[in-house]
Curated annotation (Swiss-Prot):
<dbReference type="InterPro" id="IPR032859">
    <property type="entry name" value="KH_dom-like"/>
</dbReference>
<dbReference type="GO" id="GO:0005525">
    <property type="term" value="F:GTP binding"/>
</dbReference>
<keyword id="KW-0547">Nucleotide-binding</keyword>
<feature type="binding site">
    <location>
        <begin position="230"/>
        <end position="234"/>
    </location>
    <ligand>
        <name>GTP 2</name>
    </ligand>
</feature>
<feature type="binding site">
    <location>
        <begin position="57"/>
        <end position="61"/>
    </location>
    <ligand>
        <name>GTP 1</name>
    </ligand>
</feature>
<comment type="function">
    <text>GTPase that plays an essential role in the late steps of ribosome biogenesis.</text>
</comment>
<dbReference type="InterPro" id="IPR015946">
    <property type="entry name" value="KH_dom-like_a/b"/>
</dbReference>
<comment type="subunit">
    <text>Associates with the 50S ribosomal subunit.</text>
</comment>
<dbReference type="GO" id="GO:0042254">
    <property type="term" value="P:ribosome biogenesis"/>
</dbReference>
<comment type="similarity">
    <text>Belongs to the TRAFAC class TrmE-Era-EngA-EngB-Septin-like GTPase superfamily. EngA (Der) GTPase family.</text>
</comment>
<dbReference type="InterPro" id="IPR027417">
    <property type="entry name" value="P-loop_NTPase"/>
</dbReference>
<feature type="binding site">
    <location>
        <begin position="295"/>
        <end position="298"/>
    </location>
    <ligand>
        <name>GTP 2</name>
    </ligand>
</feature>
<feature type="binding site">
    <location>
        <begin position="183"/>
        <end position="190"/>
    </location>
    <ligand>
        <name>GTP 2</name>
    </ligand>
</feature>
<keyword id="KW-0690">Ribosome biogenesis</keyword>
<dbReference type="InterPro" id="IPR016484">
    <property type="entry name" value="GTPase_Der"/>
</dbReference>
<keyword id="KW-0677">Repeat</keyword>
<feature type="binding site">
    <location>
        <begin position="120"/>
        <end position="123"/>
    </location>
    <ligand>
        <name>GTP 1</name>
    </ligand>
</feature>
Length: 438
């Protein structure tokens, strides 16, 4: 499989957020001011025994009365079942076994997903006896922890990564370019996938957030082999708006995590929204190849300036990813749909692009000659050598005299010049500056 996804499920106040933050190694409710990235993060990267994995917080909105706890837990468990490779089911050792715990355990058992049962708030040896009643859940041996004190987390993580070893891998999918179709409900993601597949494979409805499971579809074309990932719709019966949005974000994030290329779908009949910016912000932050598809183009009154007006309007909202190409389509009529795989292929090839070191240094030499670095703190930046150290996205290391001398405007100048010299349409590029050891 790719990077494993771990979902944390549990009743309100059992310690989900405490465990989430402890595994992430920091408090992450407020994140860095990266353009286009939501501040209400529901995911984080973690590592144990050389296993890198993603943890998902399914906490949602905590209900204020007991009447809605069980229905909320059902939704929470369903999201975990849909999106995660392994589930951490956390219960409260002090409070003991509850009806909500039993019902969710039954759902999790039926899913056949690997489950790690964690009994939290066991702060000392005297409280170890609290864990035994949780054997009745029938989902394996409970592991006692204290998330707040960090006790027992090593044993829990050992058990967790054992499940990674047992999980199947996605080697059979490695020859496929994975495409995630992301966007708000009802922008036409499922309609487009059906048009590309030539069959009614994904449930399509005019109701935003129509209930459906995430579906992977395999397709071979002249442009290559593709795996299409549709982001599952949110549960339309939920009455809690914030909870709907959070679960939708979780589903979208897991699709983005798996993808090579993300297609942000927008509705031509609506302005770009903050939710659109958040959705594509995930893909940008995770360094995925990105393209923007504007659907329902057949419903727009057009003249010769309409396309440029749309590009300008969208570009002002998505300025942090100006590298993404645009395609105006109609999934309903099929207008320009046949161009999608060609554009995906171009974005993916640029995402994997490797520049020879000699050519790269020749270009950088010319870039510096055209515009000398500014003086920063009485010192001028000197670039000794450049090499590419990675792809997906292309990543370049500059060996310099003093990494503190790189001004943000000159960094941007270098990136723009590299883009002018090499085609990086559809992909971000990363520039790192390291001081050369004498």
């Amino acid at each position: 499989m790719g990077k494993p996804i771990v979902a944390i499920v549990g009743r309100p106040n059992v310690g989900k957020s405490t465990l989430f933050n402890k595994l992430a190694g920091k408090r992450i409710s407020i994140v860095e001011d990266t353009p286009g990235v939501t501040r209400d993060r529901v995911y984080a990267q973690a590592e144990w025994l050389n296993y890198n994995f993603t943890i998902i917080d399914t906490g949602g909105i905590e209900p204020e009365n007991n009447d809605v706890i069980i229905s909320k837990m059902r939704r929470q468990a369903q999201v975990a079942i849909e999106t995660a490779n392994v589930i951490i089911f956390i219960v409260d050792g002090r409070e003991g076994l509850t009806a909500a715990d039993k019902e969710v355990a039954q759902m999790l058992r039926k899913s056949k997903k690997p489950i790690v049962l964690v009994v939290n708030k066991i702060d000392n040896m005297k409280q170890e006896n609290y864990i035994y009643e949780f054997y009745n859940l029938g989902i394996g041996e409970p592991i006692s922890i204290s998330a707040s004190q960090g006790l027992g987390l090593g044993d829990m993580l050992d058990k967790l990564v054992e499940n990674f070893k047992n999980e199947g891998n996605e080697d059979e999918d490695s020859e496929y370019i994975k495409i995630a179709f992301i966007g708000k409900p009802n922008v036409g993601k499922s309609s487009l996938i059906n048009k590309l597949l030539g069959e009614e494979r994904v449930i399509v409805s005019d109701i935003p957030g129509t209930t459906r499971d995430a579906i992977d579809s395999y397709l071979e074309t002249d442009e290559g082999k593709f795996l299409l990932i549709d982001t599952a719709g949110v549960r339309r019966k939920s009455k809690v708006k914030e909870e709907i949005e959070k679960y939708s974000v979780i589903r979208t994030y897991t699709a983005v995590e798996r993808a090579d290329v993300c297609i942000l779908m927008l509705d031509a009949t609506h302005d770009i929204s903050e939710q659109d910016e958040k959705i594509i912000g995930y893909a940008h932050e995770l360094n995925k190849a990105i393209m923007v598809v504007i659907n329902k183009w057949d419903l727009v009154d057009k003249d010769t300036k309409t396309v440029n007006k749309y590009k300008t309007s969208i570009g002002s909202s998505l300025s942090f990813m100006s590298y993404a190409p645009y395609l105006f389509i109609s999934a309903k009529t099929g207008q320009r749909v046949n161009r999608i795989f060609k554009m995906v292929r171009e974005c993916y090839d640029n995402y994997c692009k490797q520049i020879k070191t000699g050519i790269l240094n020749d270009i950088i030499g010319k870039i510096v000659m055209m515009k000398e670095p500014p003086v920063v703190g009485n010192k001028r930046l000197k670039i000794y050598y450049v090499t590419q150290i990675g792809t997906k996205p292309p990543t370049f290391v500059f060996f310099v005299n003093d990494s503190k001398c790189i001004h943000f405007s000159y960094r941007r100048y270098i990136e723009n010049q590299l883009r002018d010299s090499f085609d990086f349409t559809g992909t971000g590029i990363k520039l790192e500056f390291r001081e050369r050891k004498e």
